Amino acid sequence: MGYQPLADDLIKVSEFNRECIYYPIKIYLCKKCQYLQNNYIVGDKILYNKNYHYRPGISKSVVDNLRMLANETIRNYDLKPEDLVVDIGSNDGTLLSQFKYLGHLNLLGVEPTGTYIFHKNHNINVVNDYFNLKSSQKINSKYGKAKIITTTNVFAHTNKLGDFIKGIKNIIRKDGIFIIENHYLLDVIKKNQFDTFYHEHLRTYSLKSLIRLMELYGFYIYEAKTSDRYGGNIQVHFTLQKVNRSSNVNKILKIETAFGLDNPKTYLKFNSNIEKIKIELFEYFNKNKSKFIVGKAFPARASIIIHYFSFMKDYLQFIAEQPTSLKIKHFVPGTNLEIKSSNLLLKNKPDIMVILAWHLFDVISEKWRQKGLKKTNFVAPLPRLKIYK
């Protein structure tokens, strides 16, 4: 995929002379483990710093999903109000705030970036540090062991994976549950989601690969679920106790085998699909080059789309984000495409809106149709070119 800037390296409009650093993205398949890995690692302190822009708390769909996770965890594991719940990579504390709303007060976030300050809004304890074996020892000493440990869209970002898992093992109770939720290899391939391959995402896991990995550190799988969140997610529950697996586990493993995740030809077809989409999208833009075209929503994955489909930046006038986003008044990394408030969309109605958060295409397009964009054509670049007139 060449060299690309970091997806979250947004440049303030007032600092437009600053240049982004480009890093390679090259994805490798491990046939034995059945997962994908970026062969270049950018340091954590570069990726996750005080200027990190992503906040789940400003997205209703994300908040709703995290509320569901909190509800299910409490119900399925008979969680008591005094049981310690630790969320690693807790960002602005949104997931933990859902536990608190449901009556659970013994909560701890672990967050290395500047978003940790938002835990204060919920009056939730937070450790402003990277999670590893060393920081886990401090957590264990001060807070004790956890009944529930969650990592939502964090595990695939982890650099020193062995040290991270050892840290989990150090702070989890014997009867505790470790919940991993991440983008899912099968859905990435099935839905042509090359946009998940940004520098923060070091690995893309199948269920088979997660089981194999966690068993090396003494964890047993208990439950596994897949969902359509973020274009396709997998949620896996591990414990230190030897337990009977949920029937879901073997069902998902059989689906992975039937799909061909262990067959290199599956990935060659995936690559071919992406190139076809690239051609179709270019032809669409070129045909409509006289139209007023904007992008809508800028999750990290959108940077990959814009750079791999490099012609897009020549057609898009700006990217619209919701008014509360920290990304407004910044440029898309490596471009002069400005991220502006979506309030502008009703003043300057676009002919075409390219929804870069394509996994929310139906929700976003319908919302803006109802808001007054009656004549706008809504476009999704993935999983294949889709146009809603």
Indicate residue ranges for each PLM-predicted region.
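Flexible, glycine-/basic-rich loop-and-beta segments that form/coincide
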Residues: G231-I274
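Conserved class I S-adenosyl-L-methionine
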Residues: P81-N91, I293-K296
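Short, glycine-/aromatic-enriched active-site segment of Class I SAM-dependent methyltransferases
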Residues: I180-R203, L207-S209, M214
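A short glycine-rich, Lys/Arg-flanked "PGG" loop and its adjoining helix->strand segment in the class I
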Residues: G162-I177
